[in-house]
Swiss-Prot record:
This is ABC transporter B family member 19. CDD domains: ABC_6TM_Pgp_ABCB1_D1_like, ABC_6TM_Pgp_ABCB1_D2_like, ABC_MTABC3_MDL1_MDL2. Changing residue 1174 to Q: Lost ATPase activity and reduced brassinosteroid export. It catalyses: (indol-3-yl)acetate(in) + ATP + H2O = (indol-3-yl)acetate(out) + ADP + phosphate + H(+); brassinolide(in) + ATP + H2O = brassinolide(out) + ADP + phosphate + H(+); 24-epi-brassinolide(in) + ATP + H2O = 24-epi-brassinolide(out) + ADP + phosphate + H(+); 24-epi-castasterone(in) + ATP + H2O = 24-epi-castasterone(out) + ADP + phosphate + H(+). Interacts with 1-naphthylphthalamic acid (NPA), and FKBP42/TWD1. Pfam families: ABC_membrane (PF00664), ABC_tran (PF00005). Glycans are attached at residues 5, 641, 758, 785, 814. Induction: By auxin (IAA). Induced by red light, but repressed by far-red light. Induced by brassinosteroids (at protein level). Changing residue 316 to A: Strongly reduced ATPase activity and reduced activity stimulation by brassinolide. Changing residue 59 to A: Impaired brassinosteroid exporter activity, but normal ATPase activity and slightly reduced activity stimulation by brassinolide.
Length: 1252
């Protein structure tokens, strides 16, 4: 995995460079708005226009008031009257702004939430409508989860309040022009002339950022897939000590994202710097001509002030509107990916109106001259002129070598794929012409690897028939021999099964899958190795149940184990893409052809006892009751108690608390900011440089304010020579400030981007490292679903960067501006400054109330969206099951249900936020009115001057904007605080099984002597269900030990405990006489090889999957391991050989091929201890025969633990242990145990023998 993923990560830049910039037209982001949304957007836009226009109107009034100040300095009574009148106008204006800003914020926020909820629904609906081939080639689970969790949030950011914000600033710009033209049209015209330069700088910045954003998203999506794979297959990663491989691959993948972040920082610094620089120089030009016009008598100081200030604020607003372009660019790039899927028309249409329904289905299926290759490997032909007929009501078995195309027959009948040529007919009608939903309603499917969803047992069975009654569900479960073990669970049918059914044994999962298919009561039954995971007792009863349910139905049985199909109506043998033999068992045996050869191969591995089938039912029924029912009930601590609650911590974080493990409760650490700074210590030089840049940027605002206030005073000079001299002086200051702004903004944003990107990368690496340090039991919990964790990994680190790195930059800048402004104000006029200081708490309180209104919703929204990511991830990863059971609408319904919480809360949130924002605006205008009135009062008393009051007032306006901007960052800072808490809850968790324990003894070599001594064990997720009680087992070094017993008896638990996935509650698990808890876990696992029942492969090449077994494996070593596992032959036959990608979770390979690669991986590891959990269950007879010999060679001289349902595969082991009721009830060699006819092993053997 590591090599391929590393290579992929390195090729990302080249691919990204070649890719054309992909972005959606902005208006198309609103494609999912309904009439109410349009009304909300209209009202919100109207509010934004009024709100935006208020500032130029304020300056119009202010300019007239300045004239009242300047022209009435000799008539103090008239001056106070004029100022008081305009102060009242400011209060009225504040009320208008209060209501308009409320409408702007409330309507746009709520509309954005509504539209994105519709987008999420439409996106998942479109994903689920795609044909299965799409998921083989174009979509990975990690990509879908990333889109649902991250891309939709980017779109929401782009179409919510930021649109209102953009309209608001654009209105300020346009209204500024209007007011400017009314006041002094020549100055306004001059202002218009310089705007294109400002717009060009901003547009170039936005264009550059769009390209970088698109590439960055693609790059991180690749990294997210690597993380999701590692977490989803954590048992394989742990077993092969692959944590560092996963981390290295992930690190390599995000390295390119890091470099793109640096570029984005430079682009932002240069973009904003140039925008403000050009704006400053433009203001200098306007100021110069304003002085000329005043001296020529073409205007006065008040009108010039109004025109200039309107132009300046208009220009600044244009620049501020550009700050939203970054969010729009990200939204467009994310929207493109979403809309690409939404608009993609699947090859196989699911539309109910597309196709016809048959009045009656008999079930005759015919393949006529079918040629087929998988879309992912079009050059590898599976079928050539393939012909086969499945008669109505008959059972036909399809057999052949692993990879011969048996399961492909099932996929084509289900219409997961369409043939390249030829026809597939149902009752003489080509299935392409039938409605897809109708077709699949007639078919019941049980796969080789059962796919369950992370919900209750009841809900999983109900996928077969959503409207089924409880009686029907229990009948289906009883028929599948599942009812007995389900009813013994504390919560029965309401028990949660965990992600992919991880809380159940393989047999239990398969029985639930069979119950699901039986509930459907289909006309056609497709059984793809449906009983392969069952123990002898369960298989016997389930096989009888299947025999009953098969009566009267067209049944297609795909089988490796030929003993299960001897009584079918017909058997078809597939070789090299064609049917080479058909007939009954007896007919084919008599031919001594391909089928007879397969039988001989299977007999070589020990299945020789073909008793009279007529005795099967009576004997199995009698014998099934002799086994303890309890032993069938629970695997591994099977199912967890799903009970959990939500609570709000003291710091406002929403927490999910498992009742089974309350000690896991986490809160955002109180000192998280200090810890985050410490975590960021390697970037201190960059942080300091960024801080210096922020401080330098912070001086720009006060400098502008001071020069501006001085210019107002200059406009009332009666000495025109002094006016000209001073104007020239201030113009040069503005030009210098423009050049200064470019450097200051570049230093600020570039260095803070380096700090932020490095912090994000480090946090992501540390989080994944911490996640992969947790014990396996942690991953068994619902809240640690792989899709949820992958989404958390993607968003939390980005939120930390946004809230901390990026926002520290703005806060430092604004705080510098605030401090500088107040120092200047107190020096100029301390009385007015004191009043300003007195009004600030009112302004801050209003904004703080807004912050509090937002704080309570972050947790709810994040939690609900995380759950939607989990549902989407499950739906995609189990897409074949979803498609086969027409469960798209059910998945979509669950998805929409989880979206209701944020939708309901968003209404209240938007209203509250809008109201409090409006209140803060009213406080601002009220404060300004009070200050101006008080200033006029001081002037009238002779204790201050017109110049001082205006200077302090202008400083107030600039400072208030800085405070407002700082406080407006509250939502992002709150979200970042939540994310920091989430990050540290992951980093701080103390794993219960530390793989890197410094005090543990390193393991250089082991003999392989294993002992379980008085072990009590229950799974952490279900501590009340004991798997082992006083369990004792000794396995001598170099010997082979088989473990048998009923499904759920705890066989796989032995292997899990040897791997130390879990620790015992009491007693010891010892290797070479040492408690394994005292041994270094990673060095111990290097000595152990594991092959699981369901092989876990990574989305890499075949070569990399095998090489995963040994660091630095050579090509010859990989090929030798593949030969030993009987995999070299089929691998060599592929066009790309060992470089063939296996697809996500090995989807491009058959079950047998996947298992052989997994075995080759274990062979390459060359372990001292070998753990085989049904290692050959997925193989056909020929492959199993060769592979069994390879395994026997591999087992020589090694301690081997074999978990087996098929007793024929373990007759040659040194010792066999029978597990029942949490203990070893019988132990000995095959011959010794067979000599005890009433023993547990003999009963199991009789069951298995007589089912044949």
């Amino acid at each position: 995995m590591s090599e391929t993923n590393t290579t992929d990560a390195k090729t990302v830049p080249a691919e990204a460079e070649k890719k054309k910039e992909q972005s959606l037209p902005f208006f198309k982001l609103f494609s999912f708005a309904d009439k109410f949304d349009y009304l909300l957007m209209f009202v919100g836009s109207l509010g934004a226009i009024v709100h935006g226009s208020s500032m130029p109107v304020f300056f119009l009034l202010f300019g007239q008031m300045v004239n009242g100040f300047g022209k009435n300095q000799m008539d103090l009574h008239q001056m106070v009257h004029e100022v008081s009148r305009y102060s009242l106008y400011f209060v009225y204006l504040g009320l208008v702004v209060c209501f308009s800003s409320y409408a702007e914020i409330a309507c746009w926020m709520y509309s954005g939430e509504r539209q994105v909820a519709a987008l999420r629904k439409k996106y998942l609906e479109a994903v689920l409508k795609q044909d299965v081939g799409f998921f083989d080639t174009d979509a990975r689970t990690g990509d879908i989860v990333f889109s649902v969790s991250t891309d939709t949030l980017l779109v929401q950011d782009a179409i919510s309040e930021k649109v209102g914000n953009f309209i608001h600033y654009l209105s300020t710009f346009l209204a500024g022009l209007v007011v400017g033209f009314v006041s002094a049209w020549k100055l306004a015209l001059l202002s218009v002339a310089v705007i294109p330069g400002i717009a060009f700088a901003g547009g170039l910045y936005a264009y550059t950022l769009t390209g970088i954003t698109s590439k960055s998203r693609e790059s991180y999506a690749n990294a997210g897939v690597i993380a999701e794979q590692a977490i989803a297959q954590v048992r394989t990663v742990y077993s092969y000590v692959g944590e560092s491989k996963a981390l290295n691959a992930y690190s390599d993948a995000i390295q390119y994202t890091l470099k793109l972040g640096y570029k984005a920082g430079m682009a932002k610094g240069l973009g904003l710097g140039c925008t403000y620089g050009i704006a400053c120089m433009s203001w200098a030009l306007v100021f110069w001509y304003a002085g000329v016009f005043i001296r020529n008598g073409q205007t006065d100081g008040g009108k010039a002030f109004t025109a200039i200030f309107s132009a300046i604020v208009g220009g600044m607003s244009l620049g501020q509107s550009f700050s939203n372009l970054g969010a729009f660019s990200k939204g467009k790039a994310a929207g493109y990916k979403l809309m690409e899927i939404i608009n993609q028309r699947p090859t196989i249409i699911q539309d109910p109106l597309d196709g016809k329904c048959l009045d009656q289905v008999h079930g005759n299926i015919e393949f006529k001259d079918v040629t087929f290759s998988y879309p992912s490997r079009p050059d590898v032909m599976i079928f050539r002129n393939f012909n086969i007929f499945f008669p109505s009501g008959k059972t036909v078995a399809v057999v052949g070598g692993s990879g011969s195309g048996k399961s492909t027959v099932v996929s084509l009948i289900e219409r997961f794929y369409d043939p390249n040529s030829g026809q597939i007919l149902l009752d003489g009608v080509e299935i392409k012409t039938l409605q897809l939903k109708f077709l699949r309603e007639q078919i019941g499917l049980v796969n080789q690897e059962p796919a369950l969803f992370a919900t209750t047992i009841l809900e999983n069975i109900l996928y077969g028939k959503p409207d089924a009654t409880m009686v029907e569900v229990e009948a289906a479960a009883s028929a599948a021999n599942a009812h007995s073990f389900i009813t013994l669970l504390p919560k029965g049918y309401d028990t949660q099964v965990g992600e992919r059914g991880v809380q159940l044994s393989g047999g239990q999962k398969q029985r639930i899958a069979i119950a699901r298919a039986m509930l459907k009561d289909p006309k056609i039954l497709l059984l793809d190795e449906a009983t392969s995971a069952l123990d002898a007792s369960s298989e016997s009863i389930v096989q009888e149940a299947l025999d009953r349910v098969m009566v009267g139905r067209t049944t297609v049985v795909v089988a490796h184990r030929l003993c299960t199909i001897r009584n079918v109506d017909s058997i078809a043998v597939i070789q090299q893409g064609q049917v080479v033999e058909t007939g009954t068992h007896e007919e084919l045996i008599a031919k001594s052809g391909a089928y007879a050869s397969l039988i001989r191969f299977q007999e070589m591995v020990g299945t020789r006892d073909f008793s009279n089938p007529s005795t099967r039912r009576t004997r199995s029924t009698r014998l099934s009751h002799s086994l303890s029912t309890k032993s069938l009930s629970l695997r591994s601590g099977s199912l967890r108690n799903l009970s959990y609650s939500y609570s709000t911590g003291a710091d406002g974080r929403i927490e999910m608390i498992s009742n089974a493990e309350t000690d896991r409760k986490t809160r955002a650490p109180e000192n998280y900011f200090y810890r985050l700074l410490k975590l960021n210590s390697p970037e201190w030089p960059y942080s300091i440089m960024g801080a210096v840049g922020s401080i330098l940027s912070g001086f720009i605002g006060p400098t502008f304010a001071i020069v501006m206030s001085n210019m107002i005073e200059v406009f009332y000079y009666t000495d025109y020579d002094s006016m000209e001299r001073k104007t020239k002086e201030y113009v040069f200051i503005y030009i210098g400030a423009g050049l200064y702004a470019v450097g200051a903004y570049l230093i600020q944003h570039y260095f803070f981007s380096i700090m932020g990107e490095n912090l994000t990368t480090r946090v992501r690496r540390m989080m994944l490292s911490a996640i992969l340090r947790n014990e396996v039991g942690w991953f068994d919990e619902d809240e640690h679903n792989s899709s949820l964790i992958a989404a958390r990994l993607a968003t939390d680190a980005a939120d930390v960067k946004s809230a901390i790195a990026e926002r520290i930059s703005v806060i430092l800048q604004n705080m510098t501006s605030l401090l500088t402004s107040f120092i200047v104000a107190f020096i100029v006029e301390w009385r007015v400054s004191l009043l300003i200081l007195g009004t600030f708490p009112l302004l801050v309180l209003a904004n703080f109330a807004q912050q509090l209104s937002l704080k309570g919703f972050a947790g709810d929204t994040a939690k609900a969206h995380a759950k939607t990511s989990m549902i989407a991830g499950e739906g995609v990863s189990n897409i074949r099951t979803v498609a086969a059971f027409n469960a798209q609408s059910k998945i979509l319904s669950l998805f929409c249900h989880e979206l209701r919480v944020p939708q309901k809360r968003s209404l209240y949130r938007s209203q509250t936020s809008g109201f409090l924002f409006g209140l803060s605006q009213l406080a601002l205008y009220g404060s300004e009115a009070l200050i101006l009135w008080y200033g006029a009062h001081l002037v009238s008393k002779g204790v201050s001057t017109f110049s001082k009051v205006i200077k302090v007032f202008v400083v107030l306006v600039i400072t208030a904007n800085s405070v407002a901007e700082t406080v407006s960052l509250a939502p992002e800072i709150i979200r970042g605080g939540e994310a920091v808490g989430s990050v540290f809850s992951v980093l701080d968790r103390q794993t219960r099984i530390d793989p890197d324990d410094a005090d543990a003894d390193p393991v250089e070599t082991i003999r392989g002597d294993i002992e379980f001594r008085h072990v009590d064990f229950a799974y952490p997720s279900r501590p009340d269900v004991m798997v082992f009680r006083d369990f004792n087992l000794r396995i001598r070094a170099g010997h082979s030990q088989a473990l048998v017993g009923a499904s759920g008896s705890g066989k796989s638990s032995v292997i899990a405990m040897i791997e130390r996935f879990y620790d015992p509650l009491a007693g010891k698990v010892m290797i070479d006489g040492k408690d394994i808890r005292r041994l270094n876990l990673k060095s111990l696992r290097l000595k152990i090889g594991l092959v699981q029942q369901e092989p876990a492969l990574f989305a890499a090449t075949i070569f990399d999957n095998i090489a995963y077994g040994k660091d630095g494996a050579t090509e010859s070593e990989v090929i030798d391991a593949a030969r030993a596992a009987n995999a070299h032959g089929f691998i060599s036959g592929l066009p790309e050989g060992y470089k063939t990608p296996v697809g996500e979770r090995g989807v491009q390979l058959s079950g047998g091929q996947k298992q052989r690669i997994a075995i080759a991986r274990a062979v390459l590891k060359n372990p001292t201890v070998l753990l085989l959990d049904e290692a050959t269950s997925a193989l056909d007879a020929e492959s199993e025969c060769v592979l069994q010999e390879a395994l026997e060679r591999l087992m020589r001289g090694r301690t081997t633990v074999v978990v087996a349902h098929r007793l024929s595969t373990i007759r040659g082991v040194d010792c066999i242990g029978v597990i029942q009721d949490g203990r070893i009830v019988e132990q000995g060699s095959h011959s010794e145990l067979v000599s005890r006819p009433e023993g547990a092993y003999s009963r199991l053997l009789q069951l298995q023998t007589h089912r044949i």
